[in-house]
Amino acid sequence: LVLLLLVFGNQSFGQFSPLTQSQAMAEMERFGSGKRVLYMAAHPDDENTRLIAWLSNALDAETTYLSLTRGSGGQNLIGDELGAELGVIREHELRAARSVDGGNQRFTDALDFGYSKSVDEVWTKWGHDDLQLQAVRTIRELKPDFIITRFPPDERAGHGHHTASAELAIECAVLAADEKYDTATAAWSVQGVWWNTSVWWDPTLKDDPEAVYLDMSGFDPLLGDTYGAIGDAARSMHKCQGFGVPINRGPREEYFKKLWGEGDLSAYLMPDRGADAQSLLAQDAAFALEIGDQKQAIAKWAELGQVLLEQTTPESDKYQRWQQVMLHVLGVYAEVFTSSNPMPEGPSYPATLVLQALNFDLEVKLASVKAPTKDMGLNPAQVLTSEGQELEVDLYDEGKITKYIRVRLEHESAIILLYLKPVAKLSDRAVGEYREAIAVEPAIHAKFDQTVYWNTGKKGTIGYSIYSKDG
């Protein structure tokens, strides 16, 4: 007997996601600010989308929302899906919100088990130490200057999950700077942890001398709307929880109170430019793109990519964001995909690498391709054409699907390294072209401890258990 089981592999959804010029400029501005903020709460829809929109687009900070859960314990206004299926919906809604407000999205493995009054119950079910380690590693990877929580670390949060998320933010800010904690990752010092409070919690907040006030009024010419309106549009992505809101373009204000640390959030929230190597390269690239100097924009953005590779991994959010902008500036379509999904289990996972020139005024060359079973250099380098070049590659990498295919492009003296994550690219008559994570479909062989007769005309039941390869 052979049973089929879907096991999801690489969880990347879509390598090629074209940017508009304004989106590319906004992303360059974030790289150029040198500022990084981590927003922490418990569930999808807990985050303050208006604040994330302001931080990402007015302050130009690299702003990430860390949601401890995926929201599988909530209700569903728009369908019958609950539990894990609801968690999938809420995760997609959360990512849709980030695509509107300009933030990035991260999760931990914490399970949303529904409402909880007790923080002790939360830590028992979540596993305090494991979640703490996940959060510290996220902080050390993203290197935020400040952490902002949606909730206070006490009973005012109104939900055990909420309280726990604020407690965790403070604990992990301290531990992230401790070189003796988790020596596998480098320590990082957060300047402070602040609570994004409101008059809902404290009606006298406006008169509190310890509260930091932020005027979020303002219009973003690149995005064509106010920061409040952008945040409201992002908020309305949380459809299954019924969080659609009307757009408000009027004045907006936010308040913050310090929970831990010595950093001055008030001074930090004043927009300015970073002076480190990454920020300066991003600023130069943005200026060149703004005045129409495409070649200089490519050169500076490519140089920034080399700097990033010295400090982060190719699959990191930051490098993948850099890569998306790089493809826009080059005017190149680049993608690695399979044309069927799921795929039968190894020993081969055939895929197609496509490279196509979209901007005919620029000469971009393919210099090399590196896959698990192919390391191909081209001498001389091959000019990308408008018809596109296709190359068959094998994604098989020691029993798994490889994380990425490395492609080296060249434009004049600029060297561009792309790390393309494989996806399944499919088409449907109702929805058109779409992408999904590649799934592997292994065969499971079953042995019975007694003889089994088929087609006897009698009904019977066969019971079985499925175990993973590692037991």
Predicted ranges, named:
Residues 13-37, 118-122, 128-335, 407, ...:
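Metal-dependent de-N-acetylase/amidase catalytic core
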Residues 341-348, 452-460:
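Short, solvent-exposed loop/linker segments at the N-terminal edge
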Residues 14-141, 163, 170-174:
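Active-site rim/loop-helix segments in enzyme catalytic domains that contact anionic ligands
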Residues 356-362, 465-471:
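Short solvent-exposed strand-capping/beta-turn motif centered on an Asx-Ser/Thr pair
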Residues 370-377:
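Short, solvent-exposed loop/linker segments at beta-strand-coil boundaries, enriched for Pro/Gly
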Residues 1-11:
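Bacterial N-terminal signal peptides
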Residues 413-452:
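Short beta-strand elements
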Residues 382-424:
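Eukaryote-biased detector of low-complexity, proline/serine/threonine-rich segments
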